[in-house]
Amino acid sequence: MIKGINHITYSVSNIAKSIEFYRDILGADILVESETSAYFNLGGIWLALNEEKNIPRSEIKYSYTHIAFTISDNDFEDWYNWLKENEVNILEGRDRDIRDKKSIYFTDLDGHKLELHTGSLEDRLSYYKEAKPHMNFYI
């Protein structure tokens, strides 16, 4: 039986710059680092970065694949301003209903999409049950 997410690993093109991004911009606690890898605790999630210089990265920008982290609604504007001040690549978000809560989409230095989201799964399901009758719900 699967018990939960064990860790998330990203390949990065420059480990030193990526360590700075995740530590200094997102506030991750660095646990260990080497010349080509680093482990962090980011909101209770084990995040691993491995430097891999010669892999294609151009397709990343075409995918909606991303990792979302929870933030409070009260911190939303502060996070947005912090990312902007630090010249993080903030992406245009999708149009959303207020019941779907707020999100900031952005990329790390290698184009991996990340999201800061104020809602929960319960918020999303409640909204969808109300607004999307074409969906089948099992909970």
From Swiss-Prot:
Keyword Transmembrane helix in record: no
Cofactor(s) required, per the database record: Mg(2+)
Active-site residue list: 115
EC number per UniProt: 2.5.1.-
Ranges for domain VOC: 4-119
Keywords for the protein's UniProt record, in alphabetical order: Antibiotic resistance, Cytoplasm, Magnesium, Metal-binding, Plasmid, Transferase
Annotated positions binding Mg(2+): 7, 66, 115
GO biological process assignments: response to antibiotic
EC top class named in words: transferase
Heme is among the record's keywords: no
Gene Ontology molecular functions: magnesium ion binding; transferase activity, transferring alkyl or aryl (other than methyl) groups
Classification via InterPro entries: Fosfomycin_Res_Enzymes, Glyas_Bleomycin-R_OHBP_Dase, Glyas_Fos-R_dOase_dom, Metallothiol_Trafse_FosB, VOC
Cited Pfam families: Glyoxalase
GO CC terms: cytoplasm
Function recorded in the entry: Metallothiol transferase which confers resistance to fosfomycin by catalyzing the addition of a thiol cofactor to fosfomycin. L-cysteine is probably the physiological thiol donor.
Family that this chain belongs to: Belongs to the fosfomycin resistance protein family. FosB subfamily.
PANTHER family: FOSFOMYCIN RESISTANCE PROTEIN FOSX, LYASE, PUTATIVE-RELATED-RELATED
Assembly information from the UniProt record: Homodimer.
Protein's name according to its UniProt entry: Metallothiol transferase FosB
Native species: Staphylococcus haemolyticus (strain JCSC1435)
Underlying gene: fosB
